[in-house]
Amino acid sequence: MIKLKSVIDAVIIRTDGFRIYKDPEKMALIRHYANTTGIIILTDSDTAGFRIRRYLKGAVGSGKITNVYIPDIFGKEKRKDAPSKEGKLGVEGIDNSILIECFAKAGIDISGEGANYVPPEDPITRMDMFELGLSGGSDSSAKRKMLLAHYGLPELLTTNGIVEVLNTMITREELYTAAEKLFDNMEDR
């Protein structure tokens, strides 16, 4: 994912391999993006990668999908002790220049010139998470779970992931309003 973040400015949702099959919250998030902004599916070029790609395409339904395919490049990734089962490099193992070429072949402009995402004027930050008690407090974990459930997001999202996703879904003001409603009765319990 680190390599991918250096190539494209987008919300990146890891499927964690076949775990996506049993993660309805993460699938709900993927469907949300497919039906609003559209999604890009980028998987390894091995059998498992294509099986996951087919599953995502079927699970998303009528949402907008753009497929990006990496070429079959054989070798061993530096971060691994042995080659993969099929001997192919995965997304994290190929050069950035090849990744950029793959996006271009799929018609995706990652230069920023043609991007239609407009960052929020008043973005949600980690400080907001702290001020709302979503991080740094004794009940922060419970509050995060409530907020994530409210928005139908996977509960395993990190604080940084929550900030990134919420900035594409809601405004800072909407976050504060939701938090006030969700957490208002917590002290009464």
Residue ranges and their predicted role:
Residues D23, A48-R51:
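Short glycine/serine/threonine-rich phosphate/pyrophosphate-binding segments
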Residues I70-L132:
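Activity-critical C-terminal alpha-helical subdomain
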Residues A34-A48:
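Acidic beta-strand-to-loop metal/phosphate-binding motif
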Residues E101, E113-R189:
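C-terminal, charge/polar-rich interaction regions
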Residues M1-I2, S6-T36:
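Acidic, glycine-rich catalytic loops of TOPRIM or P-loop NTPase phosphate-binding modules used
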Residues M1, A48, I70-F74:
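Conserved structured catalytic cores and adjacent interaction surfaces
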Residues V11-R14, I39-L42, T66-N67:
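Short hydrophobic alpha-helical runs that function as membrane-insertion/retention elements
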Residues F50-A59:
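Short Gly/Thr/Asp-enriched flexible loops that form oxyanion-binding sites at enzyme active sites
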